[in-house]
Amino acid sequence: MKLNNYQFILISLTFIHTFLLAESKVSSSLPLAQAVENVYPAIVRIEVVSEQGSGGRMMKSRSTGSGVIVSKDGQVVTNHHVAGKATRITCRLHDGEEVLADLLGADPMTDLAVLILRMKDRAPDSRPLTIANFGNSDQVEIGDVCFAMGSPAGLSQSVTRGIISNVALISPNSGSFRLDGENVGELVRWLGHDAIIFPGNSGGPLVDEKGFIIGINEVGIGSLGGAIPSNLADQVSQELAQNGMIARSWTGLECQPVLDPKEDGLLVAGIIKDSPAEKAGIKPGDIIKKYDGKKVMARIAEDLPVFNQLVYGMKVGKKIKISGLSKEKKMIWTLTTSSRESAFTKESELKSWGLTIRNFTLMSSLEARRSDKEGAQVHSVGRGGASYSAKPNLIPGDVITSIGGNPVKAVNDMVRITNIIIKGKEEPVPTLVSFERDLAQLLTVVKIGPESVENRPVQAWKPWLGVSTQVLTRELTESLNLPKSTKGVRIAEVFPRTPAEKAGIQAGDLLFRIDGQVIQAYRSEDAEVFGNMIKEYKPGSLALFSGLRHNKTLDLNVTLEKRPEPANELPNYEEETFEFTVRELSFGDRVNQRLQEKEPGLIIENVEPAGWASLAGLRQGDLILKVNGKTLSKVELFEWEMNRLIKDKSKQIVFFVKRGIHTLFLELEPDWDDTQ
């Protein structure tokens, strides 16, 4: 069969199209393979224990994020919001190996942090680290293929593919993304992309087709992701690794885009009081056209981070020549940059006050409209604590200026004075405190020091029968075909090894009288009547209990015994380092948990929600069977063992606990620098 020209052309085009599709599929898989091969083994999953002030105390929390190894000695780049407040860091490598890491430095202004793996802790036969290299983010263009890598939701490493959709993405609302008081958008213009970003991907690399890092993923909003450009990330991470911090200059200039889009330069929106810019004579409304000889311009908000990078990147103490316009007149200003302080200092906890507090920085003192940086600023207040209970009570933002007549210029003054006041005291000490709230100068009295010892009621001398009961209400007596005038109780449970069990009382027995005296219980609110009647006897007394069993008369003589010590009278121990409390097992604990009389264990009475014990997984009600393999059934032995472990700074404390019908091992790995 001969083909006409039209058929031949059609078949040829179809063949070419099929060939191109096949070639496209092959070629499209190559970038992914290369990117994965180059970078995937360098991805780490980061498990972090962080600490920050809230509710009057330093709260610990667990979180996960991602990072990427960038050096042979184990430097890992991630986000500040992942690890910037870390007290303990564990990195899981692509092959499952777990390595502890330390924080070298963190920068909230760019949301970047650098970790260093504890390489000496790795096994001698461990594989060499795979490292990823930074590319040039200035060469990235809209439409470029990219790969977002990380460990979403704390799972294993993953890769998603997308394209670059924006090379100068900023937050639509100025100052909407803040870390430690710093506006991240002041310096960062994200690379926008549509590679899917899941929770936990933060800190992972954004990679190009050649396998180079072009960004560090930071945010995911719907289907849009944002990555910190690699050029900025590389520069900041190198300085963090070397110095542990970023040194930036400060001028007091606050600029915005020009109002007239046809005009060059930037508009001065404001000048901070007493700043280098104010001293140079720059005023709001002036136009800046050149900064240190470099032409500057901002017609839209996306242009501002470029200018801010230039300003903050100058050496501290450098003389800067600025040219521009002031009221349409050409001007040249000269200023000397000063060192930029962080927006806030790290908060500290004062347990005896129920507060977290912090020092002022230059900017935080200016924001608070203070003339200097003296005083200790209240960061958070715990409900029920000493500061919350004072009248007037302290609130966040208050500035403590003196304690007991002693001036407070900084947090360390407050700590020192407090230690002097409470030293050797066993009760809270009412202390006069001077503080400022806005423009008001106030006084209050705060009772600081150890908590008052509770006056626990003594019950151990009282007798008991060893049963639980329910009142014979009118409804019950009618259902049991008893006379309507019947009063008494029904035995719901007989506890083991008790006077009731020894005397032969059984569950289901109906009791109407004790030694001939009617048990005046016939309403739900009469639940205490039976117990109160027994309390009238002395331990060792013989009492006759009369009633019915299976519709037959029942009379049983019972020798009442001393009531076992209730839970609130048993020895307990509050472990302050790891923040949990244990006590010895009560009779009720053994009954409820079906434990034998001599079965060892200590019950956890309380676990602070932010302590190391909580992070290890201990829960209120857990039964501690062993600590590091040792059985400890007495509180004094437990206290001695815990003090020994703390003194030795044990790297690992393993609790073998019983939870319901299950047993499990819980591992506590303290960060001793943090707990001391």
Residue ranges and their predicted role:
Residues 605-653:
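C-terminal soluble interaction/assembly domains
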Residues 285, 397, 508, 621:
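Conserved catalytic motifs of ABC-family nucleotide-binding domains
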Residues 9-18:
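Bacterial N-terminal signal peptides
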Residues 22-264, 269-280, 290-319, 326-363, ...:
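Serine-dependent protease modules
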Residues 319-321, 430-432, 542-544, 652-654:
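Short, conserved beta-strand segments of beta-strand-rich sandwich/propeller modules, principally
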Residues 1-9:
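Bacterial N-terminal signal peptides that target proteins for export
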Residues 358-386, 580-615, 619-624:
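C-terminal accessory/binding modules appended to enzymatic or scaffolding proteins
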Residues 664-676:
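Short, low-complexity, Pro/Ser/Thr/Gly-rich segments in the mature regions of secreted, periplasmic
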